[in-house]
């Protein structure tokens, strides 16, 4: 990657491909990703930009690595463990390791967020029936989650 990559239009960068969020599945909707920094040259982490259309959501998942998220566009409702967080532009959200999490748009405009993760990370795990039952024990969480 060049030392400087120009933004070509809002939330789009020269030479950075807009990709599907994940390769397949119905456990997410209306979300794309862009890999802004791939972690080479000793960086040790990746910086990704995710964009979620109004009414969209990420997958409900957990993994051994942490996430550091900064909203840069729109508003979100975020599940972190068993807590629902309302976040807006420039808010920070930390997702600790092995914590169930899901992001959903809140409002009529797209949601955009930067997500920093370690380059060396594991594959996300989706909840099994037992984990879903535990999450759904809280009525607010049960109403929120989409699988």
Where are these regions (language model features)?
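Glycine- and acidic-residue-biased ligand/ion/polar-headgroup-sensing regions
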Residues: 65-67, 71-76, 81
């Amino acid at each position: 990657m060049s030392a400087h990559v120009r933004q070509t239009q809002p939330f789009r960068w020269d030479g950075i491909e807009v990709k599907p969020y994940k390769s397949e599945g119905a456990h997410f909707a209306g979300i794309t990703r862009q890999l802004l920094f791939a972690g080479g040259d000793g960086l040790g982490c990746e910086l990704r930009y995710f964009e979620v259309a109004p009414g969209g959501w990420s997958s409900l998942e957990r993994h051994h690595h942490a996430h550091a998220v900064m909203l840069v566009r729109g508003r979100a409702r975020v599940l972190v463990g068993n807590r629902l967080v309302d976040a807006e532009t420039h808010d920070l959200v930390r997702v600790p390791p092995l914590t169930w999490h899901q992001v959903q748009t809140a409002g009529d405009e797209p949601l955009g967020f930067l997500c920093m993760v370690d380059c060396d990370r594991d594959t996300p795990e989706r909840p099994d029936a037992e984990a879903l039952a535990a999450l759904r024990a809280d009525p607010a969480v049960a109403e929120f989650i989409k699988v």
